[in-house]
Amino acid sequence: MEKMEKIKIKVVIDTNVFISALINPNGIPGKILDLIFEEKIVNYTSPSILKEIGFKCLSPKLRKYLGNENRILKILTAFSSVSVIINPNTNFNVCRDEDDNKFINVAYESKAIIITGDKDLISLRDENKYLKINNIHLKVPTPKEFIEEFEKFIS
């Protein structure tokens, strides 16, 4: 009998979750990034998300927290290597902040959870923390909500 492979949770983390994880690796976003690097969850992303993350991480404002450019580029390369990079075919326009639509597009195509602290994305979810698009329900937890549920899931 074949051994069943564990199903891994698919996620899309927004830029602020990634940056928060780098600034405070011991915080909740840091735990999420650890889960991605340990390949306990699968992160889905896109070239436009990676570009935004890179742009923000390399900004002078954040470099004082994140270190020199070489260190940041190594982290971004490592993050890319453990992520599934897709080019979504969908192009939803449901967010007040148009830049946030890219997270929805990736999550929709990959059937992933969007982990975010972004107020615009959170405002789109229903009372059960789901965003419904074209009969697809995308879970949209905050980092804290995700970790709480993940810990229940694995225990």
Swiss-Prot record:
Lineage: superkingdom: Archaea
Record-linked InterPro entries: PIN-like_dom_sf, PIN_dom, PIN_toxin-like
Disulfide bonds: none
Signal sequence range: none
Protein name, as recorded: Uncharacterized protein MJ1680
Organism: Methanocaldococcus jannaschii (strain ATCC 43067 / DSM 2661 / JAL-1 / JCM 10045 / NBRC 100440) (Methanococcus jannaschii)
Taxonomy of the source species: Archaea, Methanobacteriati, Methanobacteriota, Methanomada group, Methanococci
